[in-house]
A protein has these predicted regions:
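Membrane-anchoring hydrophobic helices of lipid-metabolizing enzymes
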Residues: 1-42, 68, 86-87, 147-151, ...
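A cross-family acyltransferase "interaction/gating" segment
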Residues: 16, 108-164
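Catalytic core of membrane glycerolipid acyltransferases/transacylases, capturing the structured
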Residues: 24-77, 120, 133-136
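Short, charged beta->alpha transition segments
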Residues: 59, 79-87
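Generic beta-sheet signal
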Residues: 73, 98, 126-129
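Catalytic-site beta-strand/loop segments enriched in glycine and acidic/polar residues
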Residues: 85-120
Length: 165
């Protein structure tokens, strides 16, 4: 039932890309923007690594229903789980990951995305999201939940991130 309600919410959002998505690429986003990015990049042949936590299980089920190729992993296991994303990039598909990982600190990039982009010689895209109307959760990452019929603007930058990672 929750997945059905979430899918209806996603369908109500008006999503606009400031510029086209380059593929294949490592798509780096902030954990706070996961709900909007999940909706924005649906059915675009993207592989994602999702935590094995309980929250990750719920998120993985929704992501799979939106056309994502899901791999479950743990940040405590290091890069062993990233091999699936590596293979996806080598085969010409994109890989998405939260730059600040599953536990944060929020908005502090970890090295995994940069490593993956360097090893596969694919661009690392920094995704920033703007919302017309959204709630913010009281969680470690202050997740944005766009309200019904919110306008979501996806900003794709492949220059800035290279300068600070």
């Amino acid at each position: 039932v929750l997945n059905f309600i979430l899918k209806l919410l996603v369908l109500s959002w008006r999503i606009h890309f400031e510029k086209p998505l380059i593929q294949p690429a490592v798509i780096g986003l902030w954990h706070q923007d996961l709900p909007a990015c999940l909706a924005a990049f649906k059915y675009k042949n993207i592989a994602v690594l999702i935590s094995q936590s309980g929250d990750g299980s719920k998120f993985a089920k929704l992501a799979k229903s939106l056309g994502y190729d899901i791999f479950r992993g743990s940040s405590s296991k290091g890069q062993s789980e990233v091999k699936h994303l590596f293979k996806a990039l080598i085969s010409g598909r994109s890989a998405g990951m939260a730059l600040d990982g599953p536990r944060g600190p929020a908005l502090i990039a970890k090295p995994g995305a940069r490593w993956l982009a360097d090893k596969t010689e694919t661009p690392l895209l920094n995704i920033t999201v703007k919302y017309s109307h959204a709630l913010r959760l009281n969680s470690w990452d202050k997740t944005f939940i766009p309200l019904p019929f919110a306008k979501i603007t996806i900003l794709i930058n492949n220059e800035t991130l290279d300068n600070w990672l």
